Structure formats: C-alpha cells, structure tokens
Design a protein with these regions (language model features):
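Bacterial Sec-dependent N-terminal signal peptides
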Residues: 1-8, 22-24
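Hydrophobic core
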Residues: 10-19
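Sec-dependent signal peptide cleavage junction
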Residues: 18-34
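N-terminal low-complexity, Pro/Thr/Ser-rich intrinsically disordered segments
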Residues: 30-52
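Structural signature of tandem-repeat unit edges
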Residues: 58, 78-99, 111-131, 140-155, ...
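A short, structured beta-strand/loop element
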Residues: 59-75
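Consensus positions within tandem repeat domains that build extended binding/scaffold surfaces
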Residues: 104, 133-136, 157-160, 179-182, ...
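A structural signal for leucine-rich repeat
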Residues: 230-232, 381-385, 405-410, 429-432
Length: 452
C-alpha cells in the first residue's frame, strides 16, 4: 500500500509553487497530497471537479461545487449523458457535504479557440444543496434539471438559469426564493412547475422574462411577493393561474392580479380574446402588463383606473381601440409603443404625469386628442414612426399650458387644432416643424388658420 505523506500548509504551498504553479490541490487520487488542515476558502478537486470549502468543524464541513469563477470542465465521456452532483466528498479524514452550487459552476460558454466543450444532457441536484448561486447554470446546455427527493433547496439566486437550454424543471417544495432574471432568456423552457406543498414566498424581478415556449404557469399559494416585469417580453403564455388559497394574488380567466384586483399584473401574450374590460376594482396596470399580446383588438379600461405602467401596451400588435377613463392620472414611459393598428387615441382630461416617449412608433395613428386639464407635456411625448398621423387636438384653455422644444417629433403634415391664441403661440415657439395650427372658435363657426 502506498504511504500517504502528510504535509503542513506552508510546506505544501512551497512545493506546489515550485513545481505546479496555480494548480488546485487534488484529493483522493493516487498522485495527490492530502492537506491536514483544510481551511475555509480552499479549492480542492475530485474527479476533475473543483470544490470550494465553505465551513470546517473538526472532520466535517461543507463545500460548494465549483470554484465560483470558472465552469466545471466535463470530460468527453460525460458529454450528452446524465450527471449527478455528489452529496458528499471525502478529503483525507474529512467529509464535506455539498450544500451550494457555485456561481458559474455549470455555466456554458463556447470556447473561443474552437476547442470542444463537453456538457451533460441532464443534471441531478442532490438533496443536500440549499442554494444555487448567481449564474450557476447560466447558458447551461442541460435539457433537464432534476432535484433529488427530500431536496433542501431554499434559494435560487439572480440569473441562475438565464440563457439556458433547459426544457423542463420541477422546483422542490423547500424552495423559498427565486432571484431576479432567474430563468430569463431560457428560450426552450416549456414546463416549469412548483410542488403542491411549496414554501416559495418571493419571486424577484423579471424571473420569467423573455421566454418563448412556456405556455402556462401556476403560482403556488405560498407566494407573497412578486417582483416587477415578471413576464417582460415573454411571448408564449396563454394563462397564468394562482393556486387556491393564495392570500396575495389572484387569477381571473388566466389574467394575473393582486388579490384585491387593484393591480393588473399581467395579461398573457397568447390569451386569444379579441376584447377585454378591466375589472372595476383595478387602479393600476403594471409595467409590461399587456406587452406582446397577439390577439387583443379592443380594450376598455375601467373607471377608477389611475395609472398605466411603463411599456404597458408595448407591441400589442393587434390593438385597434382603447378607451381611457377620466380617472387616469399617470401614463409612464413608452406605455404606447409599437401598437401597429391603433388609429385614434383620446387622452382624458385629468392626466397629470407623463413619462418620456409615452407614445412612440404608432404607424397607423391618425388622430390624437389631448384633454382639457393637461397643462404640461414632457420631452419626446410623441415620437417614432407616425406615418399616418393627420391631426392633434389640444383641448386645454389654460395660460399655464406648456410644451418643450422636443415634445412633438412629428411629420410637418400634421395639423394642430387648439382652443386659443395662447396655445397656438406656445406651439409656434416650440415646434421645430412648420405645422398648421388651427384655432377653433367655441361656436365652431369660424376657424383661424396660421402656419407656424
């Protein structure tokens, strides 16, 4: 039997520096030395996989799989085959439990030199894993992730599975937290499910953004907090359901709301109704709430609605008609963007707050009416492709009305219809184009026309 040499940390470091610089310490292989006092932060390697020591107490400790910097390098024999992360590894007389997946551990990056990079077809995560760190599976080529029975996983950090080729995943009951953009841009993801006894409480911002194959999702009753833009630019969802008994959220015909319905969070992009009316309780349309919808032609917003969020109707490509209520006070940035079929828009009297580029790229918009109490319009209020725009009606009569030099980026053929000489003067001094400005008399009998 080969005698094992025991070295002090100092001696081992000197020998390694002299003969194999920058190489990790190997464990449990015939040619490797075993460190007697493995420390927190040490990098060890076993079966070609690197681990980083997280804790040590006597002869037991914990490690993360992966060094936290570079991906695991799989061998040719592992390519396209299932791979299981070990529950424990042994280093000399010490036993370490694998409790975390390190950042970048199972990320995939094509080699810039053209060298073949091998990767397994599926990865099984043992019950001992409690955390998947940021970008742990970024760009992963595994089609399936499997969690062992009795999983203790509590946290999936930001971007853990983003840009992956994952096709399906069933998340364990123990999971409590899903980080920002955790599954975003995983374009092949078709099935994502939660355990019926899920403990999940928080899903962070854009966790399921930019997905093109996920058709349905049911949120567990345990969820208490959802981040913003959860389904931003996701193009495949037909309905989002909420498990019965959830105290924070509700689903009505596949549309996701806060429990009291005051916030409409998401109207699925592939929900195939051509018309829709928001519930009477709704006060806010969340950012990206109707984005990428492919069917909706007519939308009636309820009285009592106060706020339309950023990109709320972005790329709702079939939307032809929308009714905005007098209760509306805020329309955020790019709320109307890429609405290819919208022909007319009437902004009600009481809107006080506008984001930049609130209307951008409306190629079939012919007429815009700006309500009576709207006193100020921001930069880039109306911009982008506006090839069909013929007229803008400004109903305001106040001497406080103001616009900026770059409020209207519009064709010169567009005519303004205003209620007073003051409004005309405000426009004349700020327009960069020579648009007709027509002052409409109260009795509608006589009109005065001027060219700015």
């Amino acid at each position: 039997m080969k005698k094992t040499t025991i070295l002090s940390l100092t001696t081992a470091a000197v020998i390694l520096a002299a003969y194999v610089p920058n190489e990790p310490i190997l464990a449990d292989t015939p040619s490797s030395e075993v460190i007697k006092e493995t420390k927190v932060g040490s990098i060890i390697q076993q079966n070609n996989i690197k681990y980083k020591v997280l804790t040590v107490e006597g002869n037991i400790g914990t490690v993360q799989v992966g060094n936290g910097v570079t991906p695991v390098e799989f061998e040719a024999g592992q390519d396209g085959k299932p791979f299981t992360i070990p529950t424990k590894i042994t280093v000399g007389d010490k036993v370490f439990t694998v409790t975390e997946v390190a950042s970048q551990a199972f990320s995939y990056y094509p080699d810039e030199t053209g060298r073949i990079v091998y990767y397994p077809s599926s990865i099984t995560i043992p019950s001992s894993i409690k955390k998947i760190q940021k970008k742990g599976f970024h760009g992963s080529k595994a089609k399936t992730i499997i969690f062992d029975k009795g999983s203790q996983l509590e946290k999936i950090e930001d971007r853990a599975f983003d840009f992956s080729e994952l096709e399906e995943i069933e998340l364990p009951a123990s999971l409590e937290y899903i980080g920002t953009s955790a599954f975003s841009f995983s374009q092949k993801l078709k099935k994502l499910t939660f355990s019926s006894s899920s403990k999940l409480e928080l899903i962070s911002h854009e966790a399921f953004a930019n997905l093109s194959n996920l058709e349905k999702l049911t949120l567990p009753k345990s969820v208490k907090t959802l981040g913003s833009n959860l389904f931003r630019l996701t193009t495949s969802l037909k309905h989002v359901d909420v498990e019965e008994g959830n105290e924070s959220f509700a689903s009505v015909d596949g549309v996701l709301f806060s429990k009291d319905k005051t916030q409409l969070i998401y109207y699925p992009s592939q929900k195939n109704d051509e018309s829709y009316k928001t519930p009477k309780e709704t006060k806010e349309l969340a950012s990206y709430s109707f984005n990428k919808n492919s069917y909706l032609k007519k939308l009636e917003l309820n009285g009592g609605l106060e706020k339309i969020g950023t990109f709320a109707f972005a790329d709702a490509i079939k939307l032809e008609e929308i009714s905005l209520p007098n209760s509306l006070e805020t329309i955020e940035r790019l709320a109307f963007y890429g609405n290819l079929e919208l022909k007319e828009l009437i902004l009600p009297d009481n809107v006080k707050n506008f984001g930049k580029h609130v209307m951008n790229g409306l190629p079939k918009l012919k007429s815009l009416t700006i309500g009576n109490n709207i006193n100020s319009l921001p930069s880039f209020f109306l911009s982008g492709v506006l090839d069909s725009l013929k007229e803008i009606h400004i109903k305001n009569k106040s001497t406080e009305f103001s616009v900026k030099k770059d409020t209207f980026a519009i064709p010169e053929t567009v005519k303004f219809y205003v209620t007073s000489e003051h409004i005309k003067d405000v426009l004349k001094s700020n327009l960069s184009t020579s648009n007709d400005i027509i002052v409409e008399k109260v009795d509608n009998i006589k009109q005065e026309t001027d060219v700015a």
